[in-house]
Amino acid sequence: MSKPIVAVVGRPNVGKSTLFNSLCGQQISIVKDTPGVTRDRIYAEVSWLNHNFTLIDTGGIEPDTGDIILSQMREQAEIAIETADVIIFMTDVKQGLVDSDSKVADMLRRSHKPVILVVNKVDSFEKMMPDVYEFYNLGIGEPFPISAVNKLGFGEVLDEVVSHFPEGSDTDKEDDRPKVAIIGKPNVGKSSIINKLVGKNRVIVSDIAGTTRDAIDTAIKYNGKEYVFIDTAGLRRKSKIKEDLERFSIIRTVAAVERADIAILVIDATEGVTEQDAKIAGIAHERGKGIIIAVNKWDDIEKNDKTIYEFTNKIKDTLAFMSYAEIIFVSAKTGQRLNKIYELVDHIVDAQTMRIPTGVLNEILTEAVAMKQPPSDKGKRLKIYYMTQVSVKPPTFVMFVNDVALTHFSYTRYIENRIRESFGFRGTSIRFINRERKEKE
């Protein structure tokens, strides 16, 4: 089951970013071996009482005029309603209850999503509670007083948040259909690809409402097998502000990727691969999803015998951190190569669920270490005692070593490459965990 998504909504300057940063602490993982991926602090992974969830800060630009503020808050609320399992609605006790709070509260109430009302900047719970009680007038339940700066009141808020997380159901576990998120920048043809896949195959297509979110999934049957496609295209209300569009695009991507097994990153062939493509790709890569890069609008490109080769190299340079990704050149307009997507999805699902026997794995490890010695530091060399696979989706391996401090991502990448040479794992990331073990054990 995917991790729940918690979105933070509120007026400018009520302390959303302070709350976000305080809850995340040092848990935002910077992937050091991921060049080209700039990590926005729009989303982060948070853990509370054995509950893991993705926290999203919906706030983007903070304009000055009241009308624009209300308009932007509505967009924040809309994206939260659309993508989140639980919404934290943040207000400011010092500014008091204002009209835009009431209007956004009305939107949130109609969404039927769990809304946690948080009143920030309560520096003294004893003295300021009468001011906090004013927020009962919003009609969305009990206001929780906090001080984001002083980290007061977080426990009660987080307890309330996790109490609303959906329970895993039997149907979740039994649904073994591949779930494929179509991700990418706005206007690269994501919806067009799904529409063409639906139209081409002339089969019964059901729109399945997400169990906890408003996203619509499309189930398509091809060669007797069902696939679920998750579309991240377009907000219901289009923002006119470029930075908001980009932020909302990322939030929608996080929400879709959390629920998917495989992500198809759609790139516009006429624009080439961009930094924004790399940023979006990084979301799927960090979450260990299978990845297909679909270069759309290929029919609009003037080609010679080197065009595919040159474009592929450009993708591999810009997205070097996910060299394992499958690449396909397609046209949503003509349907060119779209049916090959199913073949790639099946292939990646097999790779994601592949298990390597420990004995075979350690033969590969022994050969790799013999060919290239592990790194050393201050006269002490890294020793890798053995390796075992502990999980799938993505394939995850534990390496038992003498000193975790001696491990280096470049040597781990070398081991990964040896494993890929032996077993493939095309289209899926591989994860490694280093564990220390004393030599006598």
UniProtKB/Swiss-Prot annotation:
<dbReference type="Pfam" id="PF14714">
    <property type="entry name" value="KH_dom-like"/>
</dbReference>
<dbReference type="InterPro" id="IPR003593">
    <property type="entry name" value="AAA+_ATPase"/>
</dbReference>
<feature type="domain" description="KH-like">
    <location>
        <begin position="354"/>
        <end position="438"/>
    </location>
</feature>
<feature type="binding site">
    <location>
        <begin position="296"/>
        <end position="299"/>
    </location>
    <ligand>
        <name>GTP 2</name>
    </ligand>
</feature>
<dbReference type="GO" id="GO:0016887">
    <property type="term" value="F:ATP hydrolysis activity"/>
</dbReference>
<feature type="binding site">
    <location>
        <begin position="231"/>
        <end position="235"/>
    </location>
    <ligand>
        <name>GTP 2</name>
    </ligand>
</feature>
<dbReference type="GO" id="GO:0005525">
    <property type="term" value="F:GTP binding"/>
</dbReference>
<dbReference type="InterPro" id="IPR031166">
    <property type="entry name" value="G_ENGA"/>
</dbReference>
<protein>
    <recommendedName>
        <fullName>GTPase Der</fullName>
    </recommendedName>
</protein>
<dbReference type="InterPro" id="IPR006073">
    <property type="entry name" value="GTP-bd"/>
</dbReference>
<comment type="subunit">
    <text>Associates with the 50S ribosomal subunit.</text>
</comment>
<keyword id="KW-0547">Nucleotide-binding</keyword>
<dbReference type="GO" id="GO:0042254">
    <property type="term" value="P:ribosome biogenesis"/>
</dbReference>
<dbReference type="InterPro" id="IPR032859">
    <property type="entry name" value="KH_dom-like"/>
</dbReference>
<dbReference type="InterPro" id="IPR016484">
    <property type="entry name" value="GTPase_Der"/>
</dbReference>
<keyword id="KW-0690">Ribosome biogenesis</keyword>
<feature type="binding site">
    <location>
        <begin position="10"/>
        <end position="17"/>
    </location>
    <ligand>
        <name>GTP 1</name>
    </ligand>
</feature>
<feature type="binding site">
    <location>
        <begin position="57"/>
        <end position="61"/>
    </location>
    <ligand>
        <name>GTP 1</name>
    </ligand>
</feature>
<dbReference type="InterPro" id="IPR005225">
    <property type="entry name" value="Small_GTP-bd"/>
</dbReference>
<feature type="binding site">
    <location>
        <begin position="184"/>
        <end position="191"/>
    </location>
    <ligand>
        <name>GTP 2</name>
    </ligand>
</feature>
<dbReference type="InterPro" id="IPR027417">
    <property type="entry name" value="P-loop_NTPase"/>
</dbReference>
<dbReference type="InterPro" id="IPR015946">
    <property type="entry name" value="KH_dom-like_a/b"/>
</dbReference>
<feature type="binding site">
    <location>
        <begin position="120"/>
        <end position="123"/>
    </location>
    <ligand>
        <name>GTP 1</name>
    </ligand>
</feature>
<keyword id="KW-0342">GTP-binding</keyword>
<feature type="domain" description="EngA-type G 2">
    <location>
        <begin position="178"/>
        <end position="353"/>
    </location>
</feature>
<dbReference type="Pfam" id="PF01926">
    <property type="entry name" value="MMR_HSR1"/>
</dbReference>
<comment type="similarity">
    <text>Belongs to the TRAFAC class TrmE-Era-EngA-EngB-Septin-like GTPase superfamily. EngA (Der) GTPase family.</text>
</comment>
<dbReference type="GO" id="GO:0043022">
    <property type="term" value="F:ribosome binding"/>
</dbReference>
<comment type="function">
    <text>GTPase that plays an essential role in the late steps of ribosome biogenesis.</text>
</comment>
<feature type="domain" description="EngA-type G 1">
    <location>
        <begin position="4"/>
        <end position="169"/>
    </location>
</feature>
<keyword id="KW-0677">Repeat</keyword>
